[in-house]
Amino acid sequence: MEVEGALKLVGEMGVYQIYLSFLLAVLLQLYSATEAILITIVGVTPPYHWVNDSFVANGSQRNEYGGQLPAEGQHQYLVFDGNFTSIVSEWFLVGGAAYEVGVSSSVYFGGVLIGVICFGQLSDRFGRKPVYVTGLALEVTFAVMNALTPIFSMFLITRFLVGVMNGGMSLVAFVLLNECIGSSYWAIAGSLGSMCFAVGIAQFALIGYFIRSWRLLAVLVNVQGAGVLALSLCIPESPRWLYAQGRLHEAQESLVSLGRRNRKKFTSFTLRPRQKDSTHSANIITIYSNSILRHRTLVMMWVWFVCSLVYYGLTLSSGDLGGDIYLNLALSGLAELPAYPLCMYLINHKRVGRRRSLAGFLFLGGGSCLLIMLVPVKEGSGPLSVLNSQTLSLLGKLNISASFNIVYIYSSELYPTCVRNLGMGVCSMFSRIGGIIAPFIPALRSVHWALPFIVFGAAGVSAGLLSLFLPETLNVPLPETLGDLQVTSYRRLETNGELMLHRHEEPGAFTNGSSEEEEELDVMMESQSLL
């Protein structure tokens, strides 16, 4: 038998797989979230004022970058008035140097992009577990170095390395978990990880509220990472990866170990060798030379880019909405939680589906951001304006989180099996580019306080409009080959209990109405009518 059949014997989601889910989808995501949004707290600018030599107070910090800062007269010293420290107060990242805070976030997301590209190939060659464990160990190491570095340039370097490890390690951990459980539980595991990432944002805000030293905070959050690393040393290698490598004996041992830990009683089984795949390998030219795939890919690249840009942009802007930064950040994370069950319900509803759900959430997310510019923010206007800004920002975060969750599922259904991984990889790359740009958007407040939200809103609405040009994939068979894209698709429509053919034509599709395709559709419809 093959791995999928063996997993049904040993348990698709038994006691031990629940433990693996808790480790890789809960604890690990709680830790990953803290590193992903670290800069939202350690990069906050405390209140400060300038003083000159004759009015220097004890404990004030000399401005070593005075030439870059807008000082007046003989002002040579900065006094930070906040009750917390950050990289801004550590290295005087104010005035002309304020942009470097955004740079520190961008280099992190640049590292994530590199990590996603490299770690996938490394795990395919050397295995899921060793690459995941090594990546997690290096991430914890680099993160501690990041907290202890004495100079800002070294802070940027270690931040980049943390991004490489976090992005790559998280991807491999996700694959490892999915390959140890039954395929029917993949969506649940993915949604669980997304929800715990959101909780991790709120958790980081809570820790930051009590620990006001940025160095101590950056060190202590890695205690959780070290704990996950210790527990990860004893997890098994992916049986699916071992099977794909032809290491049948080791794959069988891994499956038997899962069964024992699940306390399952099962008869012995033997894995048969994997059949060679005769399909040719695809490349990026395959996608862009096909008119249908090219159309879908261009739209999805923009949608992924916007989802990442707005998601991380709103998260990083949580401190710019007034009120308590820790409360804003915690609410920004918790606001995501309702998004996941809501979008899972809507995308499977026959009257809504994938396309309308994605477009609707993007419209609502973008519209919420655009409405912020209508909220009056004037001195003495009262707390209502701040409350409205916060509420609309949280509503935007909820909707864009739902869009982000949908786009993963929707994208995988738009591509044929022969190019699915490649297509998802291209879209994911543009998502990372959105993350790299996101830290710089909040800086547009210096031009106009509402400009960042106008950018987020316009991007969200434009992505929603473009997504309407994509086909619906709910209850539509997944395409296996490029040829399947040319065949008129069918969908199960519950109208008086009968099945009806739904023509689905896209720009660039070739509908030559060949008798072969019509015969194939007739056979499929007749077979379905017997159900």
From Swiss-Prot:
InterPro entries: MFS_dom (IPR020846), MFS_sugar_transport-like (IPR005828), MFS_trans_sf (IPR036259). GO terms for molecular function: transmembrane transporter activity. Keywords: Glycoprotein, Ion transport, Membrane, Transmembrane, Transmembrane helix, Transport. It is a multi-pass membrane protein. It is found in: Membrane. One of its GO terms (biological process) is monoatomic ion transport. It holds the Pfam family Sugar_tr. Glycans are attached at N52, N58, N83, N512. The chain crosses the membrane at residues 22-42, 100-120, 137-157, 161-181, 191-211, 216-236, 297-317, 327-347, 357-377, 387-409, 424-444, 450-470. It comes from the Eukaryota. GO terms for cellular component: membrane. Belongs to the major facilitator (TC 2.A.1) superfamily. Organic cation transporter (TC 2.A.1.19) family. Probably transports organic cations. This is Solute carrier family 22 member 15. It comes from Xenopus laevis.
